Curated annotation (Swiss-Prot):
Its EC number is 1.2.1.72. This is D-erythrose-4-phosphate dehydrogenase. It is an enzyme of class 1 (oxidoreductase). The keyword NAD applies. The lineage of its organism: Bacteria, Pseudomonadati, Pseudomonadota, Gammaproteobacteria, Enterobacterales. It comes from Salmonella schwarzengrund (strain CVM19633). The active site is at C155. GO terms for biological process: glucose metabolic process; pyridoxal phosphate biosynthetic process; pyridoxine biosynthetic process. PROSITE patterns: GAPDH. The gene is epd. NAD(+) binds at R12, I13, R81, N318. One of its GO terms (molecular function) is NADP binding.
Amino acid sequence: MTVRIAINGFGRIGRNVVRALYESGRRAEITVVAINELADAAGMAHLLKYDTSHGRFAWEVRHEREQLFVGDDVIRILHERTLADLPWRELGVDIVLDCTGVYGNREHGEAHIAAGAKKVLFSHPGSNDLDATVVFGVNQNQLRAEHRIVSNASCTTNCIIPVIKLLDDAYGIESGTVTTIHSAMNDQQVIDAYHSDLRRTRAASQSIIPVDTKLAAGITRIFPQFNDRFEAIAVRVPTINVTAIDLSVTVKKPVKASEVNQLLQKAAQGAFHGIVDYTESPLVSIDFNHDPHSAIVDGTQTRVSGAHLIKTLVWCDNEWGFANRMLDTTLAMAAVGFRLDASASTKL
């Protein structure tokens, strides 16, 4: 069965989802039937074809009126501001990938379903009242047909959760801290300008800028046992893509750095293949651009202090890796089937 999807919001994640769909060879499994975006069709086509981070798209892209052509495929373009006006029922949409970054609570998800979609996948953590939050590779097997409104968590949550699980399963995590070293994003300023966050009034290309993060909450949403045992901070740096995460955890069992690396390398080659990668090459952030993994462990940076404090450095392409996980989760949601009785919903 080919899953019929619509994309709401054609920004960084929305466009990368389309690119990843074609580049990963999963077009036979997923069809994009419509994209809803307030920008005009010419701009949508241009930014899909040409991308500063990811280069030129290999497929032919063109537009005619309100249709986007990717190769031989025709995708309907919509410009609806109100979720209730979206024609998902008319288009036979199975799953909406809401990539706006604006919508993300149960009411928004129900609006997509009322418009005719069978399920909704948000491209950010969303509110606590959703049916499920999925970090693919860790908990997607808990999805059920009645989980209709789902979050794909965040790029940084997808990056760090697999590593936390591996370390906890092996050594028993007592507590931890996380520092996200994140590329600049489009909620920052090119030159100094007004913003409600005074640090983000400053030019993104000229400073390392501390920002708020909900990553600790994202960790405990997946692993409730770590409530009040993880803290996180984040800084934005003057690069346009790729993120590094500094993870420090205290563990119950004594361990050596070489043992930590052996564990993570084995997982990358085995149970977490395709989700986690491992390297000991002397690489820098740009070398991970366009990497489809959720997490790439840099074994050269692993440290252990006092046998119980582990520090690791984990890289991710915060756009491309996450876009690939959106596709993975979409297929997982479709694989468990569609149960349309809203009263049967049970929270994951």
